[in-house]
Amino acid sequence: MTLNSLPVWPALQAHYEEIRDAHLRDWFAPANDRAPTRAERFTFEGGGLAADFSKNRLTDATLALLVRLAREAGVEARRDAMFAGETVNPTEGRAALHTALRANAPDAPFQAQVAAERAKMARFADAVRSGAWTGYTGKRIRHVVNIGIGGSDLGPKMVVHALHHVATPDIATHFVSNVDGADLARVLERIDPEATLAIIVSKTFTTLETMTNARSLRDWFVANGCPEGALAKHFVGVSANPAEVVKFGIAEANVFEMWDWVGGRYSLWSAVGLSIMIAIGPERFDELLAGARDMDEHFRTAPLERNLPVLQGLVGIWYRNFFGAQSYLVAPYSEALHYLPSYLQQLEMESNGKSARIDGAFVDYPTSAVTWGEPGTNGQHAFFQMLHQGPTLVPIDFIAVLTPEHPLASHHPKLLANCFAQSEALMLGRTLDEARKIVGPAKPELAPHLTFPGNRPTTTLLVDALTPRTLGALIALYEHKVLVQAAVWNINPFDQWGVELGKILGKVVEADLTAAQVDPAKHDSSTSALIARARKALGE
């Protein structure tokens, strides 16, 4: 199946040509905005969230055609296959059952394993939080260091930061991912070896960055007085390869299992989220799972026409495959969601940044857009200039939390006002005539610089309050959006072969950086020159 061979495709193309030059401000004009208003017609709810799609460049007819596209592309079948535990990752011969981690239903796949591992996590988290689990000198654990990269870092870091307001104040959580030693060194400056617990997270337990940092941290513990035999009080491992964890030196009792039917970027709901559970406690971790489960149920049961993940995915395809948008922006107006854009970068681009269809043929249409973002209002003082007046179309997801999670409540109306005003300004713009009235006859040459084209599409997601439950729903919303788009593009969102070639060549280059001699013909001339310069700087 190719996207442009679907029966609905010509109708979508014709519809795009029909409305491509229409302006959103005209669709919001009083004559066109009768009851029910455009906002009422294009605002939908699910999983405890609300999404206002009304400031997007689409009509009722657009949505109807896009929903037809979803049906013809088999979105429902792909969704149902994923929930049923079928092999939806054919290149690796695996299921993708991150939803089973929060299913809480006896007939869901792997529920006995999931429940047993979560109970083990809860016992351990309670022991650390209560002080029953101590360091080798008997000190309470005051620092948790999570060492992982990609899905073993981005998800837990994002959630722990987002839920800081409900986390224990007695334990500081640190995250180390980069193989650049500066990342670990900065954490080592802030922690106490007698009161620190390290969580090493790697599906294979062979990941270069993770194991390099883990070995350096182990050496630091020993150098700072921890006997080799007492390291078990300070190290636990999370992996799908328990034998390799034990080989590293972590006690078998301190190994938490993840499974190959959960992809790394979908794994925060598993033992990969142990740092989350220690920070917020098992009960709140269960609430996080419950929120994701709310969105799972909405995704499974809501009609496509009112299904938030489906609509989000289809709107993204509308801009990517018809308007030619090359990127989209995530702008959470919540400092608590500071790391959400980084998390979504991996979730979206590692999942759907593919050129090969499931059947092995190459696509002849764009797939994943570049995902980027920054919390509001910071972004307004950095790149919003380009969004308002630049020639490039960048669709935006605004995320607004309606009640603050902090005591400085007087700040919150200002924050929300900025979020809503930006979406309005991006939609309305300012015409040249309006600009001329502002500058008056004194400086007519300034008027073009004060014009805004408007017609810039935005979706606003509303969260009543940032709780573990609403955060779980928000994360699951984006997970399922990715699946919807993958189904339409007919690609596999659950593998990531694109990261492999660089890893293979990286090992070769690393060996050449320290080898006694290097054959200059081994690499292209650019890479050889880079290696030569680095060898000189390293003293080789």
Curated annotation (Swiss-Prot):
Please give the GO cellular component terms listed in this UniProt entry.
cytosol
Q: Keywords assigned by UniProt?
A: Cytoplasm, Gluconeogenesis, Glycolysis, Isomerase
The source's superkingdom equals: Bacteria
A single GO BP term for this record reads: glycolytic process
Give its E.C. classification number: 5.3.1.9
Active site positions, chain numbering:
E350, H381, K503
Q: What broad class describes the main subcellular location of this protein?
A: cytoplasm
Q: Name where it's found.
A: Cytoplasm
Q: Which PROSITE patterns match?
A: P_GLUCOSE_ISOMERASE_1, P_GLUCOSE_ISOMERASE_2, P_GLUCOSE_ISOMERASE_3
Q: Name one GO molecular function term.
A: carbohydrate derivative binding
What does the record give as its pathway? Answer: Carbohydrate biosynthesis; gluconeogenesis; Carbohydrate degradation; glycolysis; D-glyceraldehyde 3-phosphate and glycerone phosphate from D-glucose: step 2/4
Q: Which CDD domains match?
A: SIS_PGI_1, SIS_PGI_2
Q: What is this protein called?
A: Glucose-6-phosphate isomerase
- Gene behind this chain? pgi
